[in-house]
């Protein structure tokens, strides 16, 4: 774009590494796709396109092309101009949001460790760089960027597959103003993996924040929080893994504290957050021993520090960990009894408290970020979905089941929108198309989430949890039996002795049902809630706001039902946006650069459906748009379509495509949409559009400079002031302002222009407040033309195809001559009453002086007499009679108040307006550098002369009496009281908390291999076994019989909207010949009038 020289990390002088867009591959097979990705990966090109879909391969190293130079390179550039990059996709989202006024979202998918979180960071960073804004906007940008290290510290952890694995899902909405400035945001978080707080698998870590705190805390913090080395804590030493390659926990701790500061968390609350994290670590070191079948705390000394950090009594903590209060009902009476727990139950209670504390702390941090970015109303947004990837471990439990279910839903969205919906659209629009087969994973989603006929796995699980009385393995075995009965015959389900198998789109996964029911119940006992509500720290009490006094009614919600609802809500949110896709691929399990595992990549290529995606994109169309939206976006390309096309929408689209010389085989016309085949053709349209805007921007600049130089409204402003002189107080901030006229920008508002006459000039247009019979304020648009006053409102359509949409409605149209007068107060308020024949209008506008002055001028021109103006502090206006309700009058009384803002008080049929004193009634505007002499206003739009007509004819070859001259169209457009223990617990006490022993089988790493593809893989192979013939091109239209035609002898530029423009030698189809000399014809799909003496018949 432009002549500016571009530099890039991929120079055009070096060898081409594979193909940038895999639609161009000569062979479409999984082998060819994987080979192209490998070639580019080995040459350090990690991004590749499939049409508009971006494929990203995790390089496991920092790449050099994410600097400010690349941001400048991709900003505003078309996709084809530069090599594939995540910045190109982000820029496309950002520009489409502003141009099409539509919310956008990007769905980042891939298995764990494929690079999804890093991709989300680059998207946020790019948007922060390219969007403008002042100090407030910069603050929002800082929060958006700093939310990443904070949420990663508390929500990410090292797993076997990924050193920085997201153990929660998030959907980050960046909200924008209409000018494209990020001025707000919102985070939705899903399914934090709470179990990781109390248990980790081998070679994994707990959440990053624990290790950051232990490494980065100051000496004072270590003393106050009783911090030791990680191997001292039971909640950290089970996996015997404390360090991560390439991770500096001490440095990251500083970033986490800085992020909390930016987000607005006060230092005192930051200290309490860290105190809570340390308290959870110390809580985990409380162990239990058996004492006559009951649990007893093994070392009472270990109670002191967690109780101190949590602000609770150590005796109550011991009591709640080893006993539980249970309510029983007998004969209509209820009583509470204390039940002593055994060792297993006590350990479960301790872990439940730790998980509950951490989960509520995480929710607090997310809410703190949302509060810092909150804005009163939503305008535009870009959503970034960064959610846990599909994962398979040696032992897969309830968390993996939920994670893989959400990924299954995301795969379904991709199938619905890129494979299924696209092909169905071609059929509906009448585009010739040969269907392409693919595996639809909806059958797997139904297996998991169906409610009835047959019930899905989640429904069976909820049913077992609602009726279970046994705990532990008893309920889990009941679940397994019921699953076998409900879905045992499903082709994507198998059961085994300790669990079940689901044939996911990404392969077969074996789930161990042990703990499924307990984790699905997700209940925090009321004893523990009561315990935390006794904390001396208000912050901790705030995390437990439950009211436990009332009776509990209804079945409590389960973790499974929550994640199912969240997943479906997420899908609904994504479907309301224009989606973009990033498909992340993990090249190896070693996490090393340039290590390529062919089988692993081919498996991902297959289950991600890349081959089918390429085939649909290759045989299909890169771009499709409804006729009306296409015309709206590209209307500026031709004079005939700007500001709007007045003929048939289909013909308007064809006219635009012909105007840019697009080849007919590059597009097809559907019944309601235009389909453009290649991206290059679309880029052509965008380039021409930008050049047009550039030219018009220069014209606007010239007009603005001329406006500033002339200051033509100085005299008009003084005339308006004379109307109110010695009659009404003036406002200080408005007496010297310039008059603009059109404050609504009617040139760009066809929905408002439709109520005006075809050539009706606009003197004034503004959004005002109208007060009804009950003095209820309603927004209206007030438009003044030389003949009429228009009041336009908005209503929701109740019938028809546009049902539910809000449309503009003409509420009132009053002829200037029908006005009886205008009433105003003597104070500095903005109210006025338009007195009419039927009923009056009580309005409020900050530009009342400008409106009243123009209204007086137009009234005098139409009636040859001045408009009656009334100035009084007691006014009345008549209201329209409705039904049985009386019409009558309403009174408005103005009184002296305080300040410049009016205070309204309604009492029956009277409104009292109080406002402070303004400038004296004798105030006049100050003349600032007005040019001498009255500025001249053009009364007619400029015209372009046509070639000289034949002798005896007037301009444009028409007798002077044949047609009237063009009418003017003139639109003015603007602009603790507990004492701490004497020291940290001794190391000897912690020595009893040794890592748990592991059976030899747990060291098996076969789960890291590429998973068995299962039934989903077999169905994919069956569905794509035969390659269909790609859809044929656009059928050749039948030749149309021609009527009489003529050839242009001279160039003619139309002087009105119903006239044709043409160049020399263009052939026009004659529709009608009129004796007046004006003929009617058709050219480029548009009909209009033209002078007959400018053409010759052929």
Swiss-Prot record:
Q: Which residues form the SH3 domain?
A: 1041-1098
Q: Which UniProt keywords apply?
A: Actin-binding, ATP-binding, Calmodulin-binding, Deafness, Disease variant, Motor protein, Myosin, Non-syndromic deafness, Nucleotide-binding, Phosphoprotein, SH3 domain
* Positions annotated to bind ATP: 110-117
Xref: PROSITE patterns: IQ, MYOSIN_MOTOR, SH3, TH1
Give the region (Actin-binding) as residue ranges. Answer: 579-589
Q: Where would I find the Myosin motor domain in this sequence?
A: 17-690
**What processes in GO biological process is this protein linked to?**
actin filament organization; endocytosis
Q: Where is the composition biased (Basic residues)?
A: 924-937
Residue numbers of Phosphoserine PTMs: 1023
Sequence ranges assigned to domain TH1 in this UniProt record: 728-917
Establish whether keyword Phosphoprotein is in the entry.
yes
Q: Which residues form the IQ domain?
A: 693-722
Into which family does the record put it? Belongs to the TRAFAC class myosin-kinesin ATPase superfamily. Myosin family.
| Disease cited in the entry | Defects in MYO1F has been found in a patient with a form of non-syndromic sensorineural hearing loss.
User: Per its UniProt record, what PANTHER family does this chain match?
Assistant: MYOSIN, UNCONVENTIONAL MYOSIN-IF
Outline what the protein does: Myosins are actin-based motor molecules with ATPase activity. Unconventional myosins serve in intracellular movements. Their highly divergent tails are presumed to bind to membranous compartments, which would be moved relative to actin filaments.
Q: What is this protein called?
A: Unconventional myosin-If
Recorded source organism is Homo sapiens (Human)
